[in-house]
From Swiss-Prot:
Places the protein is found: Cytoplasm
Keywords carried by this UniProt record: Cytoplasm, Fatty acid biosynthesis, Fatty acid metabolism, Lipid biosynthesis, Lipid metabolism, Magnesium, Metal-binding, Transferase
Organism: Streptomyces coelicolor (strain ATCC BAA-471 / A3(2) / M145)
EC number(s) recorded for this UniProt protein: 2.7.8.7
InterPro entries: 4-PPantetheinyl_Trfase_dom (IPR008278), 4-PPantetheinyl_Trfase_dom_sf (IPR037143), ACPS (IPR002582), Ppantetheine-prot_Trfase_dom (IPR004568)
GO cellular component entries: cytoplasm
Source organism superkingdom: Bacteria
Record's protein name: Holo-[acyl-carrier-protein] synthase
Phylogenetic placement of the source organism: Bacteria, Bacillati, Actinomycetota, Actinomycetes, Kitasatosporales
Cofactor(s) of this protein: Mg(2+)
Main location: cytoplasm
Role according to the record: Transfers the 4'-phosphopantetheine moiety from coenzyme A to a Ser of acyl-carrier-protein.
Any one of the GO BP annotations: fatty acid biosynthetic process
Gene3D superfamilies in the cross-refs: 4'-phosphopantetheinyl transferase domain (3.90.470.20)
GO terms assigned for molecular function: holo-[acyl-carrier-protein] synthase activity; magnesium ion binding
């Protein structure tokens, strides 16, 4: 396998949270319901959502940042052991198939008010 693309992105947690407050419908345009909630059904914190948004931005960059990708066609989920993963459908899956992406690697972090993510597309 070889690396097809790499993307990295950062998001300021406070600014991202303010955007979600200012525009309540934004969360539904960016995230699936499964991404907004913790396994117990509680709402996920802003830092965690900012990291997930950074992952979606990084994923778009790894795919060459084409127009027309839908944010909700990329889902950031976490394995039982805590490892973040990506699940792609629709517009994102189509672009990934076009490029020959067979697997994804994603790393999320948030500290000192900044959320970050790195995505590697491998094929």
């Amino acid at each position: 396998m070889s690396i097809i693309g790499v993307g990295i992105d950062v998001a300021e947690v406070e600014r991202f949270g303010a955007a979600l407050e200012r525009t309540p419908a934004l969360a539904g345009r960016l995230f699936l319901e499964s991404e907004l909630l913790l396994p117990g059904g509680e709402r996920r914190g802003v830092a965690s959502l900012a990291a997930r948004f950074a992952a979606k931005e990084a994923l778009a960059k790894a795919l060459g940042a084409p127009a027309g990708l839908l944010w909700t066609d990329a889902e950031v989920w976490v394995e039982a052991g805590g490892r973040p993963r990506l699940r792609v459908t629709g517009t994102v899956a189509a672009r990934a198939a076009e490029l020959g992406v067979a697997s994804w690697h994603v790393s999320l972090s948030h500290d000192a008010g900044i959320a970050s993510a790195v995505v590697i597309a491998e094929g």
